[in-house]
Amino acid sequence: MTQTLSQLENRGAFIERHIGPDAQQQQEMLKTVGADSLNALIGQIVPKDIQLATPPQVGEATTEFAALAELKAIAGLNKRFKSYIGMGYTPVQLPPVILRNMLENPGWYTAYTPYQPEVSQGRLEALLNFQQVTLDLTGLDIASASLLDEATAAAEAMAMAKRVSKLKNANRFFVAADVHPQTLDVVRTRAETFGFDVIVDDADKVLDHQDVFGVLLQQVGTTGEVHDYSALISELKSRKIIVSVAADFMALVLLTAPGKQGADIVFGSAQRFGVPMGYGGPHAAFFAGKDEFKRSMPGRIIGVSKDAAGNTALRMAMQTREQHIRREKANSNICTSQVLLANIASLYAVFHGPVGLKRIATRIHRFADILATGLQQKGLKLRHAHYFDTLCVEVADKAGVLARAEAAEINLRSDILNAVGITLDETTTREDVQNLFNVLLGDAHGLDVDALDKEVAHDSRSIQESMLRDDAILSHPVFNRHHSETEMMRYMHSLERKDLALNQAMIPLGSCTMKLNAAAEMIPITWPEFSELHPFCPADQAEGYHQMINQLSDWLVKLTGYDALCMQPNSGAQGEYAGLLAIRHYHESRNEGHRDICLIPSSAHGTNPASAQMAGMEVVVVACDKNGNIDLTDLRAKAEHAGEKLSCIMVTYPSTHGVYEETIREVCEIVHQFGGQVYLDGANMNAQVGITSPGFIGADVSHLNLHKTFCIPHGGGGPGMGPIGVKAHLAPFVPGHSVVQIEGMLTRQGAVSAAPFGSASILPISWMYIRMMGAEGLKQASQVAILNANYIATRLKDAYPVLYTGRDGRVAHECILDIRPLKDDTGISELDIAKRLIDYGFHAPTMSFPVAGTLMVEPTESESKVELDRFIEAMLAIRHEITRVKQGEWTLEDNPLVNAPHTQNELVAEWHHGYTREVAVFPAGMANKYWPTVKRLDDVYGDRNLFCSCVPMSEYQ
C-alpha cells in the first residue's frame, strides 16, 4: 500500500524515540501483565471518575528538526545587548572544554543526586572541589555543595542565624540597605512566615537597633562600594549577633575573606565562575559557615569517609539534617540544589587555577579603574571611591545617557537616583570601555584606553589596602595541574567514568522519574539567544523568552487543569513553599489568617512537612490504612478537629505508595468541606499527563517537577524547576518580584527566587519535549510509564512481594518491593540488594522510602523492554543469590551481597572469599560492565570524622 505524504513526513518520529518499548514490545508486555491494550490497562488502574475523556489539546507532535527551527525563530526575537546591569549577574566566558565535555555531556547531566555514593565518586569529587573553592575564598570552616540561588541563600542564612543565635528572645533581622533588591525581596518573604521583623537601614546604623539576632551585610554593595566591615563585625560579635555576609566569588579572588574578618556565614552566587546568565538561571549559590554551626547548615555537604576496604571515599555527610530524614524538623526543605552548575564553577576554578583567576579578577578591576579614571577626568562624579568591578556614575542628563546606551545596544543599570550603574566582567574588552566612554561622554571625549591604563596600572587606590587579600587561595594540587586543555579534558573524563548515569544504564529510582533527556531538548540551552540575557534587561529585549515561557505556561495550564501558572520557583521544594504561601495569603485575604494546620499523609515526601513548616504551618500527620491509602476516617476526624484552623492538605497523586487511590476526590471534598485548600504534590505527575490532571481531580494548587515529568535532566542533583499551577482564586497570591513586573501577573506577593522566572534558561527543554510529543504522545508516555512499572511488578512479585497495589493488583508508575520478609528470613537487607545491583550495572532503586526496608522502582516510559528485562533478570539473580545464603552455600558474613559492590582493585588482589571472582564482578556477564571505584561506604566513620575539604592527591591514587 502506498504511504501518504503525512506518513512519510513522520511528524511523530520523536515519540518513538522517547518511548523505550516499541509497539511489538508493548504488546508482549501487555500480554505479561494481562491486558489487551494500553487503554484497557489504564482503564483497570485509574479511577474512572478522574479519567479525562480526551487528552488536553497542546498541539500535534512534530519532529526534532521542526521543533528546533520553530524555537530558534522564537529565540531570535531576543535582543543580545551588552549588559552592564550587574546586580549579581554578569556575562561570562565558559571555557569550551567545560562546555563540550561537561555541560553538553549526558554522563554529567543525566546523573542523579549522589545518595548512592559508590556510583557517584566523580561528581562528589567535583563538588568537594566546589566546597574547597568556597572555603578558600570565604575564609570559613565548612561549606555546602550549593544552594538554589544567592537570594535563597540569604534567606537560609537568616534562618540559620536564628537557629544558632544565643539571643533567643531577639526576633529582628537587620539587612544593610545596599544588598541586592532581589535578595531583600526573598528575605522578606521568608521572614514573614517565620515571624521575624526585617529592618533595612544603612550598615552604620545597625547598632542603633535593638533585639537583633542576625545581620546581613554585602561586601560589595549593590551599587559597587567595597566595604571594610571588620570593625563593625567585631562590635556585632561582642553583642552575640550572628553576622552573614553576601559576597562575590570573583571579587573574593582579590578581596579579604569575610570569614577572616569574623563573619559567621558567607554566601553568594557562583555564577561568575563560568555559568551563563541565562535570563536568571540556573546558577549555584555558595554557602559557608563556622565549624561550630555545622549541624545547622542548610543544603547538601560532601564529606570524606572510608570505604569497606579502608580507602578514601566521598559521600553526602550529616544527612540527618536534611528533609528526607528530619521532615518538618529539617534545617531546610532543600532537595534539588544546583549540582551541575556548582560543578561548572568548580571546574572553572580547576581549569584557571589561582593564577588564572587572579589574572581575570585583576583584569576586570583594571578595566573598572580605566573607566573610572577617564570619567573623572571628564568631570563625572563616582558615588563610591572604593570599588571592584562596579561604578555608580552620577550623570546630569540621565535620559540622554540611557538613550545613547540603547542606540549602542548597551544596557546600564538605570534604577539608581540621578546615576547609572556599570558592572564590568571577564568578557569586557578595550573596545567595550571605549564604547562606554562614548555613551557616557559623547563621541568627542578624546580618551584613550591605553593611555589611561598606564596611569592606573601603578597607582590604583580603588580597593582599600585593608581589603586586599594577603593569603594564598586554591593551593591544593587539583587547582594547579589541569590548565592545558588535554589535562582538563582527561580530568573531567576521569571523573565522569567513576559515575553511573543514564548514558550507561537505567536509573530505576522511585519518585524520581529518571526519563530520557533527549539531545534535541538540550541543544537550545546553550544558544546565545537564550544563555546571554540578563534577567533584569528591558522586557522588549526578551520577547523571545516571554513568548516561549507563555507558550510553555499555556501548555502546562492545560495539562494540569489549572487556571494560571507561576514559573518562578526553581526547585520542587521551592514550588511547594510558593504554593503553600499562596494558600496562606489567600486565607489571610479572607480574614482567615488563623488557618495554619497542614494535614500531611504519613507516606508523604520529606519536603512536604519541611515546606509546610517553612510556610509557618503546623503539620498534622494523617494515617494511611493497611493498603497504603489515606485513611478517610482519620482524615475526616483530623479535618474536623482542626476546624477553622485547617489551612490545607498536601497529598501526592498517584500516592507515594505507587497507587491511584480510588478516594482521591473524596479526600479533596473533605478538606474543602472544612474550609481547607488541596495542595497536590506534582512529584508523580508522570502518571497523570494526558490521563487525568490535578485540577480535574479537585486540587487547588500543585507544583510541577519539570526535572522529572518534563525532561529537564537532574544534573547530578540539580538544576530543577518547580513552577506552580493554581486555580483562579489563588492566582493573585503567587510570588511576584520587586525588580521585574511579571507580565499577566496581578500578584503583590514577595519573591521566592532571585530571578522573576527562576531558572529560565532550562525552560526550552520542557518546551521542546511538549512540542515534539504533542497531546497524544504525552498521553502515551504516561501510559507506557505505567505499563513498564506493572511489567516489572508482575515479573518480580513472586520473588519480592509488591507492598501496595490498587484494584486488580495493579500499580501506578512505580512499585514498592518489600524486602523485610527476606531480611527477617535470611539477614540480607535492602541495602545489600541495592549495593549488589551495582555489580550488575544498575543504580539502585529508592531505598527505604516511603517505607523502611523496601525498594521503590520507577522505570519511566523511556526504558526499552530489553533494559527492563536486564533489570528484572538482575533482581531475580540476586534473589537466587539470597537463596544460596539461606541454604548455607555462602555464609551471612561472606557472600556477594554483603560484600558488594566489588572493585577492580579487589579483583586483582589476593582472593579470600567463599565465592569466585567471576561471581563477584561479572554476575551478568562482561558486556557493558560498570566498575565502581570504591567499595561500600562507611557512613558512621564519615559523620564521626567529618572532613569536608579536598584531601591529598595521593588519597585518590
UniProtKB/Swiss-Prot annotation:
Transferase recorded as keyword: no
Catalytic activity: N(6)-[(R)-lipoyl]-L-lysyl-[glycine-cleavage complex H protein] + glycine + H(+) = N(6)-[(R)-S(8)-aminomethyldihydrolipoyl]-L-lysyl-[glycine-cleavage complex H protein] + CO2
Domain of life of the organism encoding this protein: Bacteria
Modified residues (N6-(pyridoxal phosphate)lysine): 708
UniProt keyword annotations, A-Z: Oxidoreductase, Pyridoxal phosphate
Pfam families: GcvP2_C, GDC-P
SUPFAM superfamilies attached to this UniProt entry: PLP-dependent transferases (SSF53383)
Subunit and interaction comment: The glycine cleavage system is composed of four proteins: P, T, L and H.
Family: Belongs to the GcvP family.
Alphabetized NCBIfam families for the sequence: gcvP, PRK04366.1
Protein name: Glycine dehydrogenase (decarboxylating)
Annotated source species: Enterobacter sp. (strain 638)
Lineage start: Bacteria, Pseudomonadati, Pseudomonadota, Gammaproteobacteria, Enterobacterales
Gene name, Swiss-Prot/TrEMBL: gcvP
